[in-house]
Structure formats: C-alpha cells, structure tokens
Amino acid sequence: YINYKNMSNQHTLLMSNLLPVGSNISTWWNFGSMLLICLMLQTLTGFFLAIHYTANINLAFSSVVHITRDVPYGWTMQNLHAISASLFFICIYIHIARGLYYGLYMNKEVWLSGVTLLFTLMATAFFGYVLPWGQMSFWAATVITNLLTAIPYLGTMLTTWLWGGFSXNDPTLTRFFALHFILPFIIISLSSAHIMLLHAEGSNNPLGTNSDID
C-alpha cells in the first residue's frame, strides 16, 4: 500500500516502498551499491575479455582488435569494460566525497579499508590501461614504473625487478596482465570486509540522528 500523503516530501524510492531504509538516508548513500554493480560488471566483462586476450607485446594490440572485430559481441564487452571502469571511478570519488562531507572517517576501520580499496582499484586500473600495448600503454608503463627509481638505494633494483629486465618488454606485459587479473579478486575480498565492518557499527546519516528513527 502506497501512502500518497505528503508525496512531495518523500524520497521517490521510499514513496514506492522500494527502498527499505530510514527516511534520514539521502541519494548520496546510493553510490556504495552502484560501486558493487560496477565491480560485478567489470569482473564479468573482464573474464570474457581475458579469454580472447594475448599477453604478448607482438600480439596484444592485434588481440584487442580481434576481440572488437571478430568475437561475437566482443565490442560490447570491450566498451562495457572501458566505460564502466570510468563510471567506477566517478562513483568512488562521489562515495569518498560523501564520506568526507559527513565525517564518516570517524569510523576508522571502515575508512581505512576503503582507502585500501581505492589504492588497489587505482593499481588495477593502471595495469589494465597498459594491456592493449598501444603507444600510450607503453608510455604509461615506462613513465609510471620509472617513478620507483626515485626511491633511494632500492629504486633501480625495484624497477628492473618489476620490468623483468632493463626495459618495459614482454615479461612486463605478462606480469601486468597477471596482476590485473588477480587484483579484482582482492578488491572483492576487501569490499566484503568493508561492508562487514560497516554493518558492525552502522553508517552515519545527513541528519546525524538515530538510524532507527522510523
């Protein structure tokens, strides 16, 4: 049964009884759920892309072209993976901004797990950006990994170890693909921990009132 009284003062979803939460939660609390949808979409499309991708510097770009041109609905998978990656970051930055604005960093365990999630996501995105091994991919792999050389004493050794040689080459692409494949599963694990830690104490809300106010 829908109560049509004072409709203008009620959230659209609450009005339709579709969102079983208190009235003190606003739209800004929706981005965590959107991030989970992005994560599921990225994992699924990434799996189908990985089936057809070849982690070799001579074949990587051709394999991406093959996916978009020859694989049935490959262009859909590739575009969904690329576009929802951008959407992922849009949602996470809004999610973080909401947390900063409402002081949710006071819940330290949830906040620190979220920060770890952000860093892991950024690493995953970087490794994925390199995979097509086009001109910009090669440039990104060279420039970003070269930042490690700024570390005193250990920098050059770490960079050589990461590259698998003395320049960004085939071993670099192979390990970047392996890292890009495994990191989403770490993100899923961290997301589970993030959600469990959140539900241990509950979230804050715009009014700062008791979440069971209704």
Swiss-Prot record:
State whether keyword Metal-binding applies: yes
Give GO terms: molecular function aspect only.
metal ion binding; ubiquinol-cytochrome-c reductase activity
Q: Write down the membrane topology.
A: Multi-pass membrane protein
Sequence intervals crossing the membrane: 31-51, 75-96, 111-131, 176-196
Name the cofactor(s): heme b
Q: Which terms are listed as keywords in the entry?
A: Electron transport, Heme, Iron, Membrane, Metal-binding, Mitochondrion, Mitochondrion inner membrane, Respiratory chain, Transmembrane, Transmembrane helix, Transport, Ubiquinone
Residues bound to heme b b566 are 95, 194
For this protein, what does the record note about how its cofactor is bound?
Binds 2 heme b groups non-covalently.
Binding positions for a ubiquinone? 199
| Disulphide bridges, residue numbers | none
Gene Ontology CC: one annotated term? mitochondrial inner membrane
Q: Which InterPro entries match?
A: Cyt_b/b6_N, Cytb/b6-like_sf, Cytochrome_b_N_euk/bac, Di-haem_cyt_TM
Q: Which Pfam families match?
A: Cytochrome_B
Where heme b b562 binds, per the record, is at 81, 180
Compartment annotation? Mitochondrion inner membrane
GO biological-process terms attached to the record: mitochondrial electron transport, ubiquinol to cytochrome c
Further notes on this entry?
A: Heme 1 (or BL or b562) is low-potential and absorbs at about 562 nm, and heme 2 (or BH or b566) is high-potential and absorbs at about 566 nm.
Q: Which family does it belong to?
A: Belongs to the cytochrome b family.
- How does this polypeptide assemble, per the annotation? The cytochrome bc1 complex contains 3 respiratory subunits (MT-CYB, CYC1 and UQCRFS1), 2 core proteins (UQCRC1 and UQCRC2) and probably 6 low-molecular weight proteins.
| Protein role | Component of the ubiquinol-cytochrome c reductase complex (complex III or cytochrome b-c1 complex) that is part of the mitochondrial respiratory chain. The b-c1 complex mediates electron transfer from ubiquinol to cytochrome c. Contributes to the generation of a proton gradient across the mitochondrial membrane that is then used for ATP synthesis.
Q: What is this protein called?
A: Cytochrome b
Protein source organism: Elapsoidea semiannulata (Angolan garter snake)
Q: What is the lineage of its organism?
A: Eukaryota, Metazoa, Chordata, Craniata, Vertebrata
Q: Please state the gene responsible for encoding this protein.
A: MT-CYB
